Each structure stands twice: as C-alpha cells, then as structure tokens.
C-alpha cells in the first residue's frame, strides 16, 4: 500500500487533453475500455519526450479516435496546466505507480469532418463507444476524480463554445 506521504512526493505526468467540437457545437466523448468502464471522457494522452503539447494533442487525437489533423482546426488552448490527483487505489495500477496524477494542457478543436472519419477501433484501442454531447454535460459523464478538470476546461473555453 502506498502511504499518503509517498503519494505527495510523486510527480504529475505531463499530458494533453482535447475538447473536439463538431459542426453543431457538440463535444466528442468516448467510453473507456478498462478501469472505470462506465465512464466517458474526452481524448487525452501523454506527451512523449521531445514532443511539444500541440504535437502530442494531434498525435493522441489520431491514435485514439482515428481523426487526422487535416480534419480539425485548433481554436484555443489553456494558458497553464490543469492538474488532478488519482485516487489512491489507482496509483499503483497506472504508469507503474510513478505518478500521483496528471498535469494537462487542453486544446479546443473544431472537427469539420464527418462521423465516418472517426474510428475508435485503432491499433491500441482505448474506447468501446463514442458519441457527441452538449459541452455542459461533460462534467456529468466523467469519473468523479476528473470532474473539476472538466469544469475548468469548460471555463477556459467558454468564449468559444
């Protein structure tokens, strides 16, 4: 078992998150395959060494959703990092127990492709289903420990929604 003092000494994992809006202004969410399987989330993923946040965002978008960079436009990004803590029971299960949570740079993207451009059956699938929802509904569908992140993302992008 990991002690609270040990958790506090762990770093945050650098990560990007993507709010992808369709032509109707709805946000893309997908249902996780593993641990909180009933949870829906927006695409997100780690930043590889030597990669900047924008490059990571576009790479993760394609890896997780099949959406290619020629089908999106970046509209905005968060000014700073938004952090969240993992629940203690997940720390040892994710990323070899090396991180206490994640610090995320979020990007708002406009998707101008068609729904058939989306393919979650990727090389390393993370999702079992996807849908478009109203941005205001995002905090209701995410796991509780990420809810504050989604509220902060909505606030950061409110002028563009």
Report residues per predicted region.
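Residue-level signal for short, function-critical loop segments
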Residues: 33, 46
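A conserved beta-turn-beta hairpin within the catalytic core of GNAT-like acetyltransferases
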Residues: 35-38
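Entry beta-strands of beta-propeller and related beta-repeat scaffolds
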Residues: 26-27
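Unchanged
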Residues: 47-144
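A short gly/proline-enriched turn/hairpin at secondary-structure junctions
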Residues: 41-43
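Acidic, metal-coordinating catalytic segment for phosphate/diphosphate chemistry
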Residues: 1-21, 96-97
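Charged phosphate-binding loop/patch that engages nucleotide di/tri-phosphates or the phosphate backbone
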Residues: 135-161
